[in-house]
């Protein structure tokens, strides 16, 4: 029996049969993995509370096919302290990964970015910058990053004094006169996005709008449950 061992975070879990759980993990070396955690809902394991979201775990598992079986969990760190809206933000990034990652596909650098983002959300005065950086990294990792420096049609450099529109999976191009104002980005904001410079609140708002547009397309227009929880507060 071949046993694999990886650092991982729990993305999603749900009841399975009488005492077990189905768990989706984000593993450092192999990406998203789905497992059966036998007895995971038993009173003994619930009391131990090892397999908790937002905790760096070392997991060992075995099996073939798309659904593996957990052998053991071991916590490597304490649970990242997340409460209130910060907890909802962490749930949001978990749902993004759960929905968008392909099974057992390694994502170079994304695991470390996720771990750093959890810590930043927990400790930052304003967690929005950490959230935008994570979203941008996720979009790039999935292969849908765009060039924030050039007009996709003319090939000319983006200029701070001009306005541009965004085309999904392609990039930015000079604004057309008939386009709605709320779909327009200033060249100044686009260039700041290229540098990940969020010192200006207008840039941060543009980053949120861009990420929401890009992710909505990747999600197929289906709403995120965690976002509904967050906006309800």
Curated annotation (Swiss-Prot):
DNA damage listed as a keyword: yes
Single GO biological process annotation from the record: DNA recombination
One Pfam family recorded for the sequence: RecO_N
Keywords assigned: DNA damage, DNA recombination, DNA repair
GO CC terms of this entry: bacterial nucleoid
Classification via InterPro entries: ARFGAP/RecO (IPR037278), DNA_rep/recomb_RecO_N (IPR022572), NA-bd_OB-fold (IPR012340), RecO (IPR003717), RecO_C (IPR042242)
Similarity field: Belongs to the RecO family.
Known function: Involved in DNA repair and RecF pathway recombination.
Protein known as: DNA repair protein RecO
């Amino acid at each position: 029996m071949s046993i694999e061992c990886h650092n991982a975070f729990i993305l999603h879990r749900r009841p399975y049969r009488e005492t077990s759980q189905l768990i989706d993990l984000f593993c450092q070396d192999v990406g998203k993995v789905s497992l059966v955690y036998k007895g995971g809902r038993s009173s003994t394991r619930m009391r131990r509370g090892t397999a908790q979201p937002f905790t760096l775990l070392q997991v060992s598992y075995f099996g073939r096919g798309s659904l593996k079986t957990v052998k053991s969990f071991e916590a490597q760190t304490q649970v990242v302290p997340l409460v209130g809206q910060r907890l909802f933000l962490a749930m949001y990034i978990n749902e993004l990964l759960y929905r968008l990652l392909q099974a057992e596909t390694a994502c170079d650098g994304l695991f470390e970015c996720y771990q750093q983002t959890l810590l930043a959300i927990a400790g930052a005065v304003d967690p929005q910058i950490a959230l935008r950086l994570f979203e941008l990294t996720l979009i790039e990792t999935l292969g849908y990053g765009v060039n924030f420096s050039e007009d996709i049609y003319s090939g000319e450099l983006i200029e701070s004094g001009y306005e541009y529109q965004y085309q999904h999976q392609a990039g930015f191009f000079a604004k057309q006169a008939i386009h709605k104002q709320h779909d327009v980005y200033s060249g100044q904001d686009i260039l700041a996005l290229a540098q990940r410079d969020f010192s200006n609140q207008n840039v941060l708002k543009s980053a949120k709008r861009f990420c929401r547009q890009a992710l909505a397309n990747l999600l197929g227009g289906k709403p995120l449950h965690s976002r509904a929880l967050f906006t309800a507060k």
